[in-house]
């Protein structure tokens, strides 16, 4: 994450564990101050799904949290107004001796944000690498047989999104796999756009899976949270099917050209450097080699 986000808040690993030196230096007073600053009733929203009523729910909440008062200090806000590093195509190889497989993860930060309407973006990715029948998986798994599975996806945040491609491949085909990934992306944003069959499969798949996404209370809750988290209209899930049905191949191709840009993806490879490093020259990308503990 720091490789693509730099000093941006999203550059902190998603695990939330932070930096060991910083954690070791924290005091109980600092933790309490952070809790008081952020965990407060005027900065909270409650979502409830179940066999209940608003009156019953409010009564229970008042009983449990009625005495919880907001502090006098202003409610804090998060800022994402931090530039990310300019995209720079390269490979970072992390040496893991004797690994029979290599794990490849390539990523770039997109200009689009989670609060944008990304229906077309997600549909375009589904064709490229977001489903089992995607081009990336069909190439590396079904045609080449170098991987049990390869995929691409858009990592969702409120602010800047990340496009990522991932594959676990046999060690002696690491370099070739990166070449094929680049080839698929290049073709997708070039002359090898979305076919009629791919468009139909993507539309039908997304529309037909909608009912199954709300079979449980937890699924309904997740939909409610997403609407609020990403500033979506209340009727988002009622209108999304029509958005899928109106998709065109030209829309998907244009969105792909705007987002899946060839030539500026950072690849991180975990594998046996003795086997993998000699293969990286054929990718045409600059690379560095590091030990896992660096």
PLM region descriptions:
Residues 150, 181, 202, 220-225, ...:
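Generic long, charged, amphipathic alpha-helical segments
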Residues 1-43, 67-115, 126-175, 197, ...:
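Non-catalytic beta-strand/loop surface segments
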Residues 167-195:
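Extended amphipathic alpha-helical segments enriched in small hydrophobics
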Residues 63-72, 183-192, 282-292:
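A common structural junction motif
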Residues 59, 113-118, 174-178, 278-279:
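Solvent-exposed, non-transmembrane alpha-helical starts
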Residues 50-55, 170-174, 272-274:
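Helix N-cap motif at beta-to-alpha junctions
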Residues 200-207, 211:
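Small-residue-rich helix-loop
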